[in-house]
Amino acid sequence: MRKLGFKGRCEKRVLSKCKEVCRTYDPIQSVYADQLQGNEAIREFQCNVQLDDGVHMTDFVCVKTDGEFMVRECVQRKYLLKPMTIRLLDISHAYWTRHGVADWGLVVDADEK
C-alpha cells in the first residue's frame, strides 16, 4: 500500500490479465504481478487501485475465475512492524472488509536467512 502520488522508480509493463498498464514500484510488486499473470485461478487484476479516501492505493485487486475478489498488499519484511506500515495496512484491510472482500492478504519478500 502506498500513498497516492508516490515518487519513486516505476516500471511500466503491459500484461494480458491487467486491465491497464501495470505500474510496479518495487521488486516485490513486479514479481507478484508475474505470478498473477501465470496463475490460472486469476481472471484479471488491477495495480495500484485508489481507495475512496483519495490518499492511498492498494497494490493489487484481483478477480478470480469464480468471480470472487482478492486483494494483496506488498510489504518488505523489514517494514512489517513499523507503526506507519501497520497503520496503512489497517486502513487497507478495513476498507476492503467494508467493501465485502474477504480474501485480503500480504505479499512479503523472502527471509534472507
Q: What name fits each language-model region?
A:
Residues M1-K113:
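Electrostatic, structured charged patches in enzyme active sites and in nucleic-acid/phosphate-binding
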